[in-house]
Amino acid sequence: MVAPVWYLVAAALLVGFILFLTRSRGRAASAGQEPLHNEELAGAGRVAQPGPLEPEEPRAGGRPRRRRDLGSRLQAQRRAQRVAWAEADENEEEAVILAQEEEGVEKPAETHLSGKIGAKKLRKLEEKQARKAQREAEEAEREERKRLESQREAEWKKEEERLRLEEEQKEEEERKAREEQAQREHEEYLKLKEAFVVEEEGVGETMTEEQSQSFLTEFINYIKQSKVVLLEDLASQVGLRTQDTINRIQDLLAEGTITGVIDDRGKFIYITPEELAAVANFIRQRGRVSIAELAQASNSLIAWGRESPAQAPA
């Protein structure tokens, strides 16, 4: 009977000892976590410091009372600390990326904080980088378009100026050519006017301008209608010396007023431009021709005396 009682007492003492050890270990673990918790709060920086834990209420017998809701408070503090760390990391990452944007860096920042930044925040930063790159590309395209337009406008103005200068130069050359032609015609007219002198009763009388022009016209018409004229007869008809008549005919030939040839027998043969072209065509077609062949062909190509000569000018 005594043995079972001792067994019960020993079992009760063993259970009490186990409970005592369990409580002692729990208090030691709580005391060891409190310094570590204080160090973590100090490293968080900008994290708001949680309120102090309630002091332990003394228990009877001098033993401290267990803190109320200690585990819940510790978990809340850890969550707040992690949130603060994440915000600090994101702010630091964004500051780095903004600094790189100002320096012209197009790629997203890859720092030691990239592993801690959230995927959503990283996506926003990448979209911001893409928008910035698109704006820069559009601005570069606008600048290039402005440059090309300015270059085309400058080339167009240069071409317009070149055409204007060419037109002015062409007009100036045409004006000079007209003036030179008019000057030559006037000089030739004066030469002819001085050459045609009517000798009457041994006294030379110079014609007026109107008379000289009329006499020249009649002189040319007489040659054209006669076709073949003897130079001595022509000189006597117009009242000039034979040499002066020859000189006047040569001047008219040089001017292109009349066309023809002066043969070695002292005759002038007037040939129209059409007849001259027909003779030239005959020579080109036949190749080499003799004088006899040319003379024979001329009888059919040139109208010899078909027009009755007009009355010689008085």
Swiss-Prot record:
Regions that span the bilayer: 1-28
Membrane topology of this protein: Single-pass membrane protein
One annotated Gene Ontology cellular component of this protein: nucleolus
Effect upon mutating residue 227 to R: Weak or no effect on ufmylation
Motif (UFM1-interacting motif (UFIM)): 195-209
Pfam families, per database record: DDRGK
Region (Mediates interaction with CDK5RAP3): 1-114
Region (Mediates interaction with UFL1): 216-314
Organs and tissues of expression: Widely expressed (at protein level). In the brain, highest levels in medulla oblongata, followed by cerebral cortex, cerebellum and frontal lobe.
Residue intervals annotated with topology Cytoplasmic: 29-314
SMART domains assigned: DDRGK
Sites bearing Phosphoserine, chain numbering: 72, 114
Residue span, PCI domain: 229-273
Mediates interaction with TRIP4: annotated span: 118-216
Location(s) in or outside the cell: Endoplasmic reticulum membrane
Post-translational modifications reported in the UniProt record: Ubiquitinated. Ubiquitination probably triggers proteasomal degradation and is negatively regulated by UFL1, the enzyme involved in the ufmylation of DDRGK1.
GO function term, MF aspect, one: UFM1-modified protein reader activity
Region (Disordered): 31-75, 100-186
Record field: compositional bias (Basic and acidic residues): 124-186
Record-listed cross-link Glycyl lysine isopeptide (Lys-Gly) (interchain with G-Cter in UFM1), residues: 267
Role played: Component of the UFM1 ribosome E3 ligase (UREL) complex, a multiprotein complex that catalyzes ufmylation of endoplasmic reticulum-docked proteins. The UREL complex plays a key role in ribosome recycling by mediating mono-ufmylation of the RPL26/uL24 subunit of the 60S ribosome following ribosome dissociation: ufmylation weakens the junction between post-termination 60S subunits and SEC61 translocons, promoting release and recycling of the large ribosomal subunit from the endoplasmic reticulum membrane.
UniProt disease annotation: Spondyloepimetaphyseal dysplasia, Shohat type: An autosomal recessive skeletal dysplasia that affects cartilage development. It is characterized by vertebral, epiphyseal, and metaphyseal abnormalities, including scoliosis with vertebral compression fractures, flattened vertebral bodies, and hypomineralization of long bones. Affected individuals may exhibit a small trunk, short neck, small limbs, joint laxity, bowlegs, and/or abdominal distension with hepatosplenomegaly.
Family classification: Belongs to the DDRGK1 family.
Name under which the protein is recorded: DDRGK domain-containing protein 1
Lineage: Eukaryota, Metazoa, Chordata, Craniata, Vertebrata
Underlying gene: DDRGK1
